[in-house]
C-alpha cells in the first residue's frame, strides 16, 4: 500500500484536488490517502472540503496576522517537517502555485519523496507577474517527479524548461472533474451565491 499525502491550503486547491483524493480513496487496498490542510485560507478550505464530503486528516493552522512571505514559508515548512516525521509518505501531491504548493514540494524534495504536481506548466515567464506565484509554480515543476499539465500548451512550456517528456502528462483541468463530484443539491445551493 502506498501512503499518498495531499498538501493544500486554499479553496482553489481543494476544488482541484478533491476529485483526485476521492478517486484514490476508492482503492483503500492500494492507497492510504493522507489529507493535510495548511489552512492558508482556513475557513474557505475547510468549507470547500465539506462540499466534497472530505475532512483533513491533518490541520496545520499555519497562518498568523501580518506575516511576511518568508514567515509564512518558514511556518509551513516547519509544520510539514513534523508531518513527515510522524507519517510514512511515499508520494506528495500538490496543485497549482501557492506558498503551500511550493512548501509541500520542497519539504518532500528535501526528504527525497516524489512530488506530483497537478496543474503544472502554467507560465507567464515574468517572475513578478503573478507575484510570487510564477516563481512558485516554476520551482514546483522543477522538483516534481510527475507533472500533470492541463493542456498541450502547458506541456510544451515544461518541455522548454527541459522537464523530461516522460514526467509530463496532459490530463485536462481537474476543476471539470470537481463539478462531476458534487451532488446536485450542493450545486443548486451554490447558485444562491
Give names to the regions the model predicted.
Residues 36-38, 43, 143-193:
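A nucleotide-sugar donor-handling region in carbohydrate enzymes
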Residues 133-146:
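Membrane-proximal helix-turn-helix segments that form the acceptor-binding/catalytic region
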Residues 93-111:
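An aromatic- and histidine-rich active-site surface loop
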Residues 3, 90-91:
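Structural motif
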Residues 1-39:
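N-terminal subdomain of nucleotide-sugar transferases
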Residues 117-131, 145:
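A short, histidine- and acid-enriched strand-loop-helix "catalytic/donor-clamping" loop
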Residues 29-75, 79:
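Conserved nucleotide-sugar phosphate-binding/catalytic loop shared by glycosyltransferases and other
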Residues 83-90:
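Glycine-rich phosphate-binding loop signature in dinucleotide/nucleotide-binding domains
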Amino acid at each position: 500500500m502506498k501512503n499518498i499525502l495531499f498538501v493544500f491550503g486554499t479553496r482553489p486547491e481543494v476544488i482541484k484536488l478533491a476529485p483526485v483524493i476521492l478517486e484514490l480513496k476508492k482503492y483503500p487496498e492500494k492507497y492510504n490517502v493522507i489529507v493535510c490542510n495548511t489552512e492558508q485560507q482556513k475557513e474557505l478550505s475547510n468549507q470547500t472540503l465539506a462540499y466534497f464530503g472530505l475532512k483533513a486528516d491533518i490541520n496545520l493552522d499555519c497562518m498568523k496576522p501580518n506575516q511576511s512571505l518568508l514567515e509564512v514559508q518558514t511556518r509551513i515548512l516547519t509544520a510539514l517537517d513534523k508531518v513527515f516525521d510522524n507519517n510514512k509518505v511515499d508520494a506528495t501531491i500538490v496543485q497549482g502555485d501557492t506558498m503551500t504548493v511550493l512548501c509541500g514540494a520542497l519539504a518532500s524534495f528535501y526528504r527525497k519523496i516524489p512530488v506530483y504536481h497537478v496543474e503544472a506548466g502554467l507560465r507567464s515567464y515574468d517572475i513578478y507577474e503573478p507575484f510570487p506565484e510564477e516563481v512558485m509554480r516554476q520551482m514546483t515543476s522543477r522538483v516534481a517527479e510527475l507533472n500533470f499539465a492541463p493542456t498541450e500548451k502547458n506541456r510544451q512550456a515544461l518541455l522548454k524548461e527541459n522537464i523530461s517528456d516522460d514526467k509530463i502528462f496532459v490530463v485536462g483541468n481537474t476543476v471539470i472533474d470537481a463539478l462531476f463530484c458534487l451532488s446536485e443539491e450542493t450545486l443548486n445551493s451554490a447558485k444562491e451565491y
